[in-house]
Amino acid sequence: MNAGDTAFILLCAAFVFIMTPGLAFFYGGMVRRKNVGNTMMQCVFIMGVSVIMWVLVGYALSFGGNHAGIIGGAKWFGFNGVGMKPGPYADTIPNLAFAAFQMMFAMITPALITGSVAGRMKFKALVLFIILWSLIVYYPMAHMVWGEGGFLAEIGSVDFAGGNVVHITSGVSGLILALTLGKRRGYDQGVYHVHNTPFVFLGAALLWFGWYGFNAGSALAANGLAAHAFMTTSVSAAAALVSWMLIEVFSEGKTTLVGASTGLVIGLVAITPGAGFVPMWAAVICGLLVSPICYFGVKLIKGKLKIDDALDALSADGTLGTIAEKYFGTDLT
């Protein structure tokens, strides 16, 4: 084992943890005043239940053994056998450290979905949904992409830090949930305004901070690959931020803090699948392209399909990053 790698991964896990409170501020600032408490409480609840589920069954179903390439096994239920020695996924850090890092991914992913149903889903219903979604969607998906013998990994799927496992699954699930629940009352009659702009910016800043642990930590060691992922993360977020602001200037005549915050977040999402694989110039292109795609694409899709995705969560998935990794990815190790 390597003490430096272990300290690095635990620090990155703490960074990723910060993302869920950051998301609570980001979403809480965007919703109407009457929905702020409920929206933020949803993220707080997920912070608690995701840890308990991960220790009891989540880690085992995601990374413990393999059944038909779809789901893990039962050998690590209750963290039984998950100790201080390295596991099968990283040679230089304890299995516990790897499990802790992955636990934070299992926390932020269901929290992302709450943006699609803000102001429409009762808290009790959300509790049941998050528990079932984690069991039926997230754990199997994590195993298929990242687990030993996972079906998607075996056919060549590459996801450096969760663009597919985290962002596409949460984005698609949020879209389906928004369609199922229907529109908010008065959705067609009124215009919804951001409730608290400073909350939105604070949330975006915390997300950017935490995303360094999200992407750099996925190298699972304090090495050059982690440094590369750190920089591509910075570049993509910055490019998307500037790109979104330019779009606002040309289309609306002014820039907004909410727009800049949204731009940087989708830039972070876009680079996630290939943060450790794409060259720096591709990270710039990824950031520059994702803003116009989301800015105009969401308006078109929501207009055509009449979707009430409360916080436009469907726009922030990892599709562009997955494409960038496919066509621009290189072996940097």
Protein language model annotation of sequence segments:
Residues I307-D331:
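Extended ligand-binding regions for polar small-molecule ligands
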Residues M1-A316:
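Hydrophobic alpha-helical transmembrane bundles of multi-pass membrane proteins
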Residues N38, D331-L332:
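Residue-level detector of short coil/turn "hinge" positions at structural boundaries
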